[in-house]
Each structure stands twice: as C-alpha cells, then as structure tokens.
Design a protein with these regions (language model features):
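ATP-dependent small-molecule kinase phosphotransfer cores
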Residues: 1-14, 72-81
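Structural recognition of the conserved hydrophobic beta-strand(s) that form the central parallel beta-sheet
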Residues: 13-18, 37
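Conserved NTP phosphate-binding and transfer environment spanning the P-loop NTPase/kinase superfamily
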Residues: 21-165
C-alpha cells in the first residue's frame, strides 16, 4: 500500500511486527531503530540423517494457517510455494542483514502438535517434495493441541488463539 502514517512516540517504543518489518520502506531509515529477525532456524534431523530445512517447517506452518484461518486446501498452499519462495527471496532476504539480532521461533514440540493435524493428508497427497516432512513426522509422537497455550505463537498456525490475527 502507498498509505503512510506518522506516529509520534513521545519517547516511547513502537514494535512493528511482520515479515516486511526489516524493509526500510516500511520502518524507515532511522538509525535508532533496533531490528530483530524472527524465523525458524532449527534443522530437525531424522534417523536417516538428512536434516529437514527450516523452509519446510515454515511451509508446514503456512499450510496449517492457510487451512485453519483461510479455508485453503493443503494442495493450494503447496501449489503457491514457488511464488511465496520467490517473494521471500525478493522482499525479505535482502533486508535480513539489517537485523541487529535474530530469534529462532521453532518450538521443540511443534511438529508433534502438527502431526495429528497434517500427517494423514500429507500421506494421502504423497508429494515427493514433502517426503522429508513425513519422514520426521513418522518418528514423532502426537502432541495434543490442547496442551498449547491459547496465547502461544503456535496458535497462529493451528487456531484457537485468544489473540487477534
């Protein structure tokens, strides 16, 4: 959007959240700004020894969020992956070096939470590009979603959050 809005912080703090928040066109060029990149960084290694790339965990998150929040079929989200990846390379990654620090947003139990929500459908789709995701999920126990706090980041993907999105 071309809309801009000036905010007078009066000495306070403003937190801008989102995938485009590192872009200086969004947050400005002010040298006083502290920028933090938040994304999955963890690589899960199944028994086969082939690590699951963080981009696959981000895809799983997108599939769940699109399904629960947007009513989109998993196959639709998977079909959009190439376009989403191109956008990430063009609009997000160039600004990643502007971050003063980074936070790994991976939760150790998250794939176990996603497993009962996704595994059967992923098995049915049998897509070669997701075979590594299935391999990891097959090795994990189910983690009931009701164990995830309602204000957890994971709720953005599985639904049931008390926070507005």
């Amino acid at each position: 959007s071309d809309e801009t809005e000036a905010v007078d912080l009066q000495g306070g703090v403003c937190i801008v959240e989102g995938i485009h928040a590192l872009n200086p066109e969004v947050t400005g060029y002010d040298g006083r700004t502290t920028r933090i990149y938040v994304s999955v960084r963890t690589r899960i290694t199944p028994r086969s020894g082939h690590p699951l790339h963080p981009s696959k965990i981000r895809l799983v998150r997108r599939m769940l969020r699109d399904s629960t929040g947007r009513g989109r079929a998993l196959s639709e989200t998977i079909a959009m992956r190439e376009r989403v990846d191109r956008g990430e390379q063009r609009y997000i990654m160039p600004f990643k070096p502007r971050a003063h620090g980074s936070i790994d947003s991976f939760y150790s139990a998250e794939l176990g939470v996603y497993r009962p929500l996704l595994r059967d459908e992923l098995e049915r789709l049998a897509l070669p590009e997701l075979s590594d995701v299935l391999e990891v999920m097959r090795e994990l126990p189910d983690v009931p979603a009701d164990l995830v706090p309602q204000d957890s980041l994971l709720r953005e993907f599985i639904g049931g959050s008390t926070l507005p999105y």
